[in-house]
Amino acid sequence: MQLLAFGVNHKTASVAIREQITFAPERLPSALTELVNRSGAKEAAILSTCNRTELYCGCAPGQQEAVIEWLRQYHGMEPKILETCLYTHPDHSAVRHLLRVASGLDSMVLGEPQILGQIKAAYSYGLEAGTIGRVLGRLFQHTFYVAKQVRTDTAIGTSPISVAFAAVSLAKQIFGDLESTTAFLIGAGETIELAARHLFTNGVGHIIVANRNLDKAYQLANQFNGYAIPLAEMPKHLSEADIVISSTGSQLPILGKGTVERALRIRKHRPIFMVDIAVPRDIEPEVGELQDIYLYNVDDLQEVVQENLRSRQAAALQAEEIIDTQVEYFMDWVRTQDAVPVICAVRQEADQLRKEALEKARRRLAQGHDPNEVLTMLAHNLTNKLMHVPTRQLRSLGATGDELALQAALKIFDVDHFKA
């Protein structure tokens, strides 16, 4: 079975393309089932975040095109559009790619920790769908171990830097002191929680949290002395916001140009800084055309993010060394799996010969034969039966002059010398 990783990320595809290829969490189990049934993949997992959509598959050699074609058809994408931004990683490269992603080495913000939780979620969805088998199961467990090792043994995780942090950093550049500002947070997931934490740490004046699930909004708002509102009441409160950060799982925009225009009129056109971290986007792109709106999406944050890379470069080099070692360790395990069916077949054959020889010995004992004689004959017969086929095959190899096969036989039987 061949390992295959393929997909798009923030480096290869714009947010406009990435939002076409995302998978809503509630659709992942059915999508995984469909992927396996239609493409012929034996194992599969899907990682879908704001910055990347990646598929990890175990499939037969030659099935690569089928699984990629499934992804294209599932989202109804034009072949040329997908081809321009799609990357593929087979086998050894697939393992390396997943380990790098889990360790934060392939993230927009180098070393960010949120991706590991997202990979664990992808693994859980695969388990739920029944598409995680022996190989992918082992790969994901190994990935979790390596990501933890990278965090423990390097400084890759020092200084809390993330897309949320980049958004707050940009807000500070625009407003300077945040004490007199009100931040309006849309959503209540991990990214919004991080943004709230960074805003609170940087002294933001007020925090409002809007979410479909009001209980989650209350839980988040209470942590930072803010207040919560249902998402449906967002238009009523938007005029209070100096800063808007949005990250929901909505498949359609939830904040349109008309709503923002009304909020600006109420604010007497005092500017609003908006960051749309969601993919698909929560805020209609046309909102950015308004004169008093400063709208940024995840791609726009790249410049801010780049400034934070320098402190983690040395740690990233250390992490790459750890990953190099662990890729080889995992591939050694994969290679041993090719021998498992052979080992099972050989042991099964040997066990059958053992049973037959043992049954024959028991009959002779029941007939009153001398036990020592029976044991001697049992050992003799079992040795002959076990060695009959290997001996015949070795003679045949010798007759054909197959030196490589004969050398392999020496290794298999652990014979480091023989007499001519």
From Swiss-Prot:
Transmembrane segments: none annotated. InterPro entries: 4pyrrol_synth_GluRdtase, 4pyrrol_synth_GluRdtase_dimer, 4pyrrol_synth_GluRdtase_N, GluRdtase_CS, GluRdtase_dimer_dom_sf, GluRdtase_N_sf, NAD(P)-bd_dom_sf, Shikm_DH/Glu-tRNA_Rdtase. The keyword Glycoprotein does not apply. Keywords: NADP, Oxidoreductase, Porphyrin biosynthesis. Pathway: Porphyrin-containing compound metabolism; protoporphyrin-IX biosynthesis; 5-aminolevulinate from L-glutamyl-tRNA(Glu): step 1/2. NADP(+) binds at G187, A188, G189, E190, T191, I192. One of its GO terms (molecular function) is glutamyl-tRNA reductase activity. The active site is at C50 (nucleophile). Substrate binds at T49, C50, N51, R52, S107, E112, P113, Q114, Q118. During catalysis, the active site Cys acts as a nucleophile attacking the alpha-carbonyl group of tRNA-bound glutamate with the formation of a thioester intermediate between enzyme and glutamate, and the concomitant release of tRNA(Glu). The thioester intermediate is finally reduced by direct hydride transfer from NADPH, to form the product GSA. This is Glutamyl-tRNA reductase. It comes from Nitrosococcus oceani (strain ATCC 19707 / BCRC 17464 / JCM 30415 / NCIMB 11848 / C-107).
